[in-house]
Amino acid sequence: MLVQGFYTHRPYFKEILKNTTGNILECGCGEGSTMMIREHIRGTDRILVSLESNLEWLSKYTHLADANHVLQHVIADNEDCVKTGNKWVEHIEANQLTNFEVVFLDSSPWMSRKCCFDYFLDKAKVIIIHDFDYFPNNNIIGKTILRTCVDNKEKIECDLTGVVKNYKLFYPPYKHFVGTTGPPTLVCSNIMDHEEFDTLVRIIQTNEASYYV
């Protein structure tokens, strides 16, 4: 089973990796994403760039650096504010980190994900945000329009109209929830047309169950 603990993004992320060919930016290193991406791109010419602001945490992964994997330290604290989030964007700009087909946002603090989302919205083909419910619940990205609770496990529906053209919020099956919120994963694109995005969503939904076997 590919999904363990808080790695609830993995089914959707893995299917996106399988259906894209370009480079990947990972904001926030972790066992649930870094190793999976490396395994998938092994033997290809795809490049993974991993960014992390926690130097101690980053040190757990720096030994992985190779021709296909670049790891960089973002000089930013963990204060959850726009100023901190913008330091991530400043690092990206200063290091000319461009040309990513897939951007995965799982960094800390929350506003680092928001600022990187804004920056890559019209640059990356597919953006994936883990723990996405935090953002509409706090009116940071879109808004929450419906909450459904089953056995103290909550799913939300969100409205991102005017924020991003194509989006889908994915939840694990209830029995694979971690805690009360899932957590959910947003897959979105401002670059793909509706037909292409809907095809990607159908592929993910068709194969999702296989990750829980």
Regions found by a protein language model. Give the residues of each.
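A short alpha-helical cap/connector motif
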Residues: 1-104, 108-128, 132-213
